[in-house]
């Protein structure tokens, strides 16, 4: 049987490496939550129209499509989906969609996979875990020190 080569830019850990990643993730989650940041998880796909709004990153977006999609389907750009390349666009959408259910200032942390269609190299991957915390509210400067507290 031919030996399979790993897919470049998409790391997979052996169990010991996955245990290390899980441990680091737990420490981050506990630290964020200790400082009052609520955990959220957003979907992996977003409308291409939203992902490419700024324009400069559109070459890095992985488009999601069905294998047996109708070739005559004339879906518009707004109907196409892509994997998110960072957590900013999904978080902004999440806040807008759930604004009536969130308490502001809303303090969130998020740790999940993101995908970028860039050339993999040392320390740069096509799939990786991103972590972040944010505070959304009327007075962003008032909570500025809170956003940095988990980093200390």
Put a short name on every predicted segment.
Residues 1-152:
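TRNA-recognition modules of translation machinery and tRNA-sensing kinases, especially anticodon-binding
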